Design a protein with these regions (language model features):
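Conserved beta-strand-loop-beta-strand hairpin that lines the nucleotide-binding pocket
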Residues: 1-6, 48-146
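Bergerat-fold GHKL ATPase/HATPase_c domain
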Residues: 1-42, 141-146
C-alpha cells in the first residue's frame, strides 16, 4: 500500500523553504521526534535545492508505504534537468564541483535510512529519501489521514 500525503511543485527559491517546512510538518504528523524531523527536513532541503539549481525545478511527493509496522516514509524529488554526469564520484564522496555540487547529495544520504538516486543524461534526476516510521508511531491509513 502506498498512501500519498502531499505533492508540491518546486519552481522558485521560496519553494525550497516551503518544502523544508512541509517536510518537518509531515514528519511530525507521522510521529518522528524533533531530531528526526530536522534530519528529514534537512535532507529534503538539500535535494530540493539541487533540483531547483541544477535541474530547473521539479516535483516533490510525500507518501507512506506499507500496511503494517514498520511503515516507510518515502519522499520522491524529481527534476527535469540534464542529469548528473558525475553521479558515481558524487555518491562515493570523491567529487565536488566549484559550486559545491555533490555535498548535499552525500549529506542527505547520511540523514536517511534509505537513499536511491536515478539520473540519466537529458532525462533528469529522481531521488528517493526513505525513513522507517518510529516503532511508537500509530499506523498510517487513508482513514487516519482523512
Amino acid at each position: 500500500m502506498s498512501l500519498s500525503i502531499l505533492t508540491t511543485q518546486l519552481s522558485f527559491e521560496h519553494d525550497v523553504v516551503l518544502v523544508r517546512q512541509r517536510a518537518r510538518q509531515v514528519a511530525k504528523l507521522l510521529g518522528f521526534d524533533a531530531q528526526d524531523q530536522t534530519r528529514i527536513a534537512t535532507a529534503v532541503s538539500e535535494i530540493a535545492r539541487n533540483a531547483l539549481n541544477y535541474g530547473g525545478g521539479g516535483k516533490i511527493e510525500f507518501e507512506v508505504n506499507g500496511k503494517t509496522a514498520p511503515q516507510l516514509m518515502v519522499i520522491r524529488i524529481s527534476d527535469r534537468g540534464r542529469g548528473i554526469p558525475n553521479l558515481l564520484e558524487i555518491m562515493e564522496g570523491r567529487y565536488q564541483s566549484r559550486t559545491g555540487m555533490g555535498l548535499g547529495i552525500v549529506g542527505a544520504r547520511r540523514l536517511m535510512d534509505q537513499f536511491q538516486i536515478e539520473s540519466a543524461p537529458g532525462a533528469g534526476t529522481t531521488v528517493l529519501l526513505k525513513k522507517l516510521l518510529p516503532a511508537t508511531a500509530d499506523l498510517v491509513s487513508q482513514q487516519r489521514m482523512n
